[in-house]
């Protein structure tokens, strides 16, 4: 449904066939846009068409570009991002982003390689200094023996005989080797050989071994001494330790016994009445001893009373002694028990 002329302004004109009465097209545009076959009579009459000869369309210099934009659309032109086109046409070639990190690493490696090559060429051109070996400071004042030997003057002539260490010298069990006649060296001649090449050392050592004194091995004596020491140690063990309880075990047994007694005494007696406490054993025995002494003293006084005294004073004294004896006997019976309970004071 059309509500008047279109208000869209752009390179793409609206369709004039929707509302032909609202559009005024020039004659040149009618044949190009609407077409001659439609033969729409917008604002011209048949007489003007008949009398006026048709003219060709007026095409400006930018008409081709406008037509191309109308066919392709303006969105393709507006959304061009760095040569990337959204239209059907051929797009420009996209450039790959440059990796600056790899480029920097490559340049650093090139610089390091060039620096190493310069160092190598510099080292090859200069002599290397020798590294001094470590030497203890206590040998600073000690002269080198090799240096002293090198500084000594050599022999005047090369005809002097050199002194060599023989095979049979400074060897053996520590005893001086027997003097055995050795072959005399022949005077040097024109065909003289080096010293020591004409001596049969194997035969010489065999003769020296036969003539050397034999020494008995001391292994049997050492074995006898070890066996004697073991026998004495076994006898001492049998006499002092075998069959006897060690001293530390005896002490441990006494300690356990004392701990058991203390634990037994500290436990409350089930036969003890409430409000009482058990009298210590030493106090009980001390009290019992005093009661026995009092009993013997009362019996002695009772025996010493006169038998024929019938006075009131004698009778009262006898009755008093009897009453005390009864009390002492009752107390002796009480304190003779293994456990005596005493009432605690409030």
UniProtKB/Swiss-Prot annotation:
Its main location: cytoplasm. The modification Phosphoserine is found at residues 91, 136. Residues 251-343 form the Enkurin domain. Keywords: Cell projection, Cilium biogenesis/degradation, Cytoplasm, Cytoskeleton, Microtubule, Phosphoprotein. Residues 1-35, 114-137, 167-197, 260-280 are annotated as: Disordered. The keyword Secreted does not apply. Residues 174-190 have a biased composition (Pro residues). GO terms for biological process: establishment of mitotic spindle orientation; motile cilium assembly; non-motile cilium assembly. Residues 91-171 are annotated as: Required for binding to microtubules. GO terms for cellular component: 9+0 non-motile cilium; centriole; centrosome; ciliary basal body; ciliary base; cilium; cytoplasmic microtubule; microtubule cytoskeleton. Residues 114-125 have a biased composition (Basic and acidic residues). It is found in: Cytoplasm, Cytoskeleton, Microtubule organizing center, Centrosome; Cytoplasm, Cytoskeleton, Microtubule organizing center, Centrosome, Centriole; Cytoplasm, Cytoskeleton, Cilium basal body; Cell projection, Cilium. Interacts with alpha-tubulin. Interacts (via central region) with CCP110 (via N-terminal region); competes with CEP97 for binding to CCP110. This is Enkurin domain-containing protein 1. The gene is ENKD1.
């Amino acid at each position: 449904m059309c509500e008047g002329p279109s208000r869209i302004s752009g390179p793409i004109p609206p369709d004039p066939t929707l509302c032909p009465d609202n559009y005024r097209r020039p004659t040149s545009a009618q044949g190009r846009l609407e077409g001659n076959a439609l033969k729409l009579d917008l604002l011209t009459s048949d007489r003007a068409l008949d009398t006026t000869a048709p003219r060709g369309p007026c095409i400006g210099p930018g008409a081709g570009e406008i037509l191309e934009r109308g066919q392709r659309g303006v969105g393709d032109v507006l959304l061009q991002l760095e040569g990337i086109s959204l239209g059907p046409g051929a797009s420009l070639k996209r450039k790959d982003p440059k990796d600056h990190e790899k480029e920097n690493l490559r340049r650093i490696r090139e610089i390091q390689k060039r620096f190493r090559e310069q160092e190598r060429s510099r080292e090859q051109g200069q002599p290397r200094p020798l590294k001094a070996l470590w030497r203890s400071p206590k040998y600073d004042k000690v002269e080198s023996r090799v240096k002293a030997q090198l500084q000594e003057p050599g022999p005047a002539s090369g005809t002097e005989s050199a002194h060599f260490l023989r095979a049979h010298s400074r060897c053996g069990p520590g005893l001086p080797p027997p003097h055995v006649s050795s072959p005399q060296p022949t005077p040097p001649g024109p065909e003289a050989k080096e010293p020591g090449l004409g001596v049969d050392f194997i035969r010489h050592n065999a003769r020296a071994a036969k003539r050397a004194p034999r020494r008995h091995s001391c292994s049997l004596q050492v074995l006898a001494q070890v066996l004697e020491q073991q026998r004495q140690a076994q006898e001492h063990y049998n006499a002092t330790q075998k069959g006897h309880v060690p001293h530390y075990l005896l002490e441990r047994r006494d300690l356990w016994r004392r701990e058991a007694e203390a634990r037994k005494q500290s436990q409350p007696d089930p036969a003890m009445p409430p409000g009482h406490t058990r009298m210590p054993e030493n106090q009980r025995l001390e009290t019992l001893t005093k009661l026995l002494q009092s009993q013997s003293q009362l019996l002695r006084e009772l025996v010493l009373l006169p038998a024929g005294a019938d006075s009131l004073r004698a009778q009262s004294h006898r009755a008093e002694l009897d009453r005390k004896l009864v009390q002492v006997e009752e107390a002796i019976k009480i304190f003779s028990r293994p456990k005596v309970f005493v009432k605690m004071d409030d």
